């Protein structure tokens, strides 16, 4: 049985036409579907709202995926040398906005120099699945102007464990808590 559609030309907007289902659609017992009315503007608004909801959902999801417990704070307009090493697995520290990809190999120290000329927050991830829970290792980097960085430096200072020799090789990792936000 074909579905009959009744067009309502008495709509206030000139470019839209209301559509009312006047016959039984696919579900016979559903009175709500029988009495549905659509016009182009309300349909467009509905699509627009759903699109905004999906965009907001994806932004919220991406924020959750990039959330970190600590933030590395660095100054801008300064050459920064990063010395990295690993004890157990190969790591690949990747921040695409800065063009930085640093590979850490177990038992070796790698040196990388980079320069940040713009202030802001930068996000990255571990670029390789290199061990347990490394499929999602977010990185948050805060680049501050040099004057603001000096104020931050005076407030937080260097971690005490950087100046002491540690018998436990993993103790220095926990010493960086004060250095990061």
UniProtKB/Swiss-Prot annotation:
One of its GO terms (molecular function) is cytochrome-c oxidase activity. The keyword Zinc-finger does not apply. This is Cytochrome c oxidase subunit 2. GO terms for biological process: ATP synthesis coupled electron transport. One of its GO terms (cellular component) is mitochondrial inner membrane. Its cofactor is Cu cation. InterPro entries: CcO_II (IPR045187), CcO_II-like_C (IPR002429), Cupredoxin (IPR008972). It catalyses: 4 Fe(II)-[cytochrome c] + O2 + 8 H(+)(in) = 4 Fe(III)-[cytochrome c] + 2 H2O + 4 H(+)(out). It comes from Paramecium primaurelia. Pfam families: COX2. Component of the cytochrome c oxidase (complex IV, CIV), a multisubunit enzyme composed of a catalytic core of 3 subunits and several supernumerary subunits. The complex exists as a monomer or a dimer and forms supercomplexes (SCs) in the inner mitochondrial membrane with ubiquinol-cytochrome c oxidoreductase (cytochrome b-c1 complex, complex III, CIII). Cu cation A1 binds at residues 126, 130, 137. Mg(2+) binds at residue 128. It is found in: Mitochondrion inner membrane. Disulfide bonds: none annotated. Its EC number is 7.1.1.9.
């Amino acid at each position: 049985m074909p579905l009959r559609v009744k067009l309502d030309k008495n709509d206030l907007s000139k470019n839209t036409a209301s559509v009312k289902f006047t016959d039984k659609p696919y579900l016979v017992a559903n009175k709500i579907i029988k009495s549905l009315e659509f016009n182009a503007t309300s349909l467009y608004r509905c699509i627009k709202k759903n699109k905004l909801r999906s965009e907001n959902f994806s932004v919220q999801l991406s924020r959750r995926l990039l959330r970190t417990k600590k933030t590395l704070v660095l100054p801008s307009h300064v050459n920064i040398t990063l010395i990295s090493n690993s004890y157990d697995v190969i790591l690949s520290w990747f921040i695409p906005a800065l063009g930085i990809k640093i590979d850490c190999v177990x038992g070796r120290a790698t040196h990388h120099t980079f320069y940040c000329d713009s202030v802001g927050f930068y996000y990255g991830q571990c670029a390789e699945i290199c061990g347990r829970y490394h499929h999602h290792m977010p990185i948050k980097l805060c680049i501050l102007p040099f004057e603001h960085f000096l104020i931050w430096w005076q407030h937080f200072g260097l971690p005490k464990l950087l100046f002491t020799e540690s018998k436990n090789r993993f103790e220095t990792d926990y010493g960086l808590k004060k250095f990061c936000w």
